[in-house]
A protein has these predicted regions:
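Cytoplasmic helix-loop-helix junction between adjacent transmembrane helices
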Residues: 1-25
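Glycine-rich segments within core transmembrane alpha-helices of 12-TM secondary carriers
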Residues: 17-43, 67, 249-261
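Cytoplasmic membrane-interface "Motif A"-like loop-to-helix N-cap segments
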Residues: 178-189
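Helix-loop-helix hairpin linking two adjacent transmembrane segments in secondary transporters
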Residues: 27-75
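Multi-pass alpha-helical transporter architecture, strongest
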Residues: 71-78, 232, 283-307
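Extracytoplasmic gate region of multi-pass secondary transporters
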Residues: 114-165, 257-262
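A late C-terminal transmembrane helix in Major Facilitator Superfamily
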Residues: 236-272
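C-terminal ends and interior cores of transmembrane alpha-helices
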Residues: 190-206
Length: 307
């Protein structure tokens, strides 16, 4: 949330979607590096080898440590965005003139003044929370356990999907600058409503290339959503609650719906005996996200100080 807010407030308004798409792209790059490493290990040593099981899986975590340290030092050198600094100056001027009372806490302000925006934003973020998990995390496990695909093939498909995700998410951000955030997010939600159940049927064909095409189509639908979501959330809330509104809506959606997606998916399979039961949950979430976006307002191209 912080990274997206920072980028959005620094970006030119007609390219905000493109620049904000760097945030989900950077997340996917981390997953891509991990997937490439896993694919290499599985093909070189075997998925069940002592090297992989005992300590090979730890190597990506060790390599990520220095990146976190580097990010910390970059972060402490950054200055607040011009939009935020302008808000701070306005508050100080108001206090100096005696026109302002005590500043309201952001969380309290969200629930008292921006509750509708918060609820809609949670609905919009739900598709990312569940869609990202289902497409890029759950499906590899599903292919191995339900479709009985070899781990190295499932890992290869995931790697190709992640490359596609990173490549197209910038295009999605750019298109959202051209066509608007609302249209893009509605398109993504509608795509998941229509395509998810047939996609799970096709996954059970056991044909590698059919499964790959299905995964890529779902991945492209996800990029339409994820490449747009960050800029949409930043444009939904005014500067004084922008970070809090983004963080609360996005993280609540991920904690409640994305975090439970694994348990719900496997529980649905166990209860119904239907191997494509997780698709029904994905469609349910997509319907909720679609409703939220239909009820939302378009803010594409606005100056963030005007939101």
């Amino acid at each position: 949330a912080g990274a997206a807010t920072f980028i959005a407030e620094y970006s030119p308004k007609n390219h905000r979607g493109f620049y904000c798409s760097m945030v989900p792209a950077s997340t996917a790059v981390g997953l891509l590096v991990g997937s490439l490493f896993a694919t290499w290990m599985f093909n070189t040593f075997g998925a069940s080898s002592d090297f992989v099981v005992n300590w090979g899986w730890r190597i990506p975590f060790v390599l990520a440590g220095p990146l976190g340290i580097g990010a910390y030092f970059v972060n402490i050198q950054l200055e607040d965005s011009p939009t935020y600094q302008a808000m701070q100056r306005a508050l100080k001027d108001a206090e100096a003139s005696g026109a302002a009372g005590a500043p309201e806490r952001p969380i309290h302000c969200l629930f008292t003044k921006h509750l509708r925006k918060l609820i809609i934003s949670i609905g919009a973020a739900m598709l990312n929370a569940v869609g990202f998990y289902v497409v890029l995390t759950y499906l590899p496990v599903y292919l191995e356990t339900a479709v009985m695909m070899p781990k190295n093939e499932a890992s290869l498909i995931t790697t190709i999907a992640l490359v596609t995700y990173v490549a197209f998410i910038f295009a999605s951000g750019h298109l959202s600058d051209k066509f608007g955030r609302k249209k893009m997010l509605i398109t993504a939600a509608a795509g998941f409503v229509v395509f998810t159940i047939p996609a799970f049927w096709l996954l059970n064909t056991l044909d590698f290339f059919t499964i790959l095409v299905v995964e890529l189509v779902m991945c492209l639908m996800l990029t339409i959503n994820d490449g747009t979501l960050s800029s949409y959330l930043c444009e939904t809330f005014p500067t004084d609650v922008r970070y809090s509104g983004f963080a609360l809506s996005f993280n609540l959606a991920n904690a409640i719906f994305g975090g439970s997606a694994s348990y719900i998916s496997f529980a649905l399979i166990n209860v119904t005996g239907d191997p494509i039961a997780p698709a029904y949950y994905m469609v349910f979430i997509a319907v909720l996200a679609l409703g939220a976006m239909i009820a939302s307002h378009e803010h594409t191209g606005k100056d963030l100080s005007e939101v």
